[in-house]
Amino acid sequence: MNLAFICKRLILFVSIFFLSVVNIYAIQDRKIEEGKAAAMANTSVTLIDIWSIYHNQAGLGYLEHISFGAFHQSGFIKEQNLQGISFALPTKTGTIGASYSYYGFSQYNEMQAGLAFGRSFTKYFSVGLQLNYLYTHIAGNYGTAQSVDFEIGILSHPINNLMIGAHVYNPSRSKMGGEEIPTIFNLGISYLFSEKVLLGIGTEKDLNRDAIFKAGIDYELIDYVSLQAGISTNPSKYSFGIGFHYLKINAHVGFLNHQTLGFTPSFTLSYDL
């Protein structure tokens, strides 16, 4: 057994250990926080855009245009980078969506492919559902694991300017290679105080972890520029970001601050036909 082989094994072990301990962005932990969501501390269960496919598929039911999106989240190390693409197609019966996300590097990675459907029954209520295929690969003799799970969400618009959203990821308690995939509940409300100011608050509960409380704000600075900020608990984090909107193009940059690990940036770009 030569020194090069030992070094490669050591690097692989350290990388996998680090990813498992500081796995904040793992797909299967549902920490997909694209630019705007990251900037608002992930108070995203009531937001309506192409990114509803990751946060609450009920939001897809209100989309009026074909949309494409791509995002990239930079991890604390490059092996923790997460990226993905999404697509939404409104039809007469509802909106069909598809998404793909990839996390990790050649020695350890996770993939998720999702197919979603969202429908608004009235302007006051919508429902969304998504089926996911999950895949995890660990190099060497560790092998791979695969699974299927689903998620469901609802949105209510009871009065002008007020939105209430609820979402459950993996209510079936599916497992991956004998390990439980997290089951996560999200509940949130948002209120549009004016054409320029949106305030959202929410709570997130993983069945195996303490509840998270979060709040975020979106402020339209000028016609083409918006600012976002947010805070959340367990652990304490704060976030901020900026959005650019021109014609049918939307771009966001969000920064999420972890009290121990520092800032992580997220970038998104979407286009509406």
List each language-model region with its residue ranges.
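Subset of outer-membrane beta-barrel
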Residues: I27-L273
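Cleavable N-terminal export/targeting peptides
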Residues: M1-G35, D272
